[in-house]
């Protein structure tokens, strides 16, 4: 998505209808974050039977460390996104 608001629900729905899979990654806290809204909206719109896998990747619900090495441990990384994508298609 290029924008968070308004977000292109039609584009996400078209992709989800084609693949049956949804992966939302963002740096905000995963619980109650934008990714949860995207997944919930798509489930409401397409129905759970049409979604094979829906995953969210976000920050854990903990304070963000000041130390860069510790911060890097909890950040959403390309490796974490790839791992979640592989799990979604397994």
Enumerate the language-model features and the residues they cover.
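Thiamine diphosphate
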Residues: 1-90
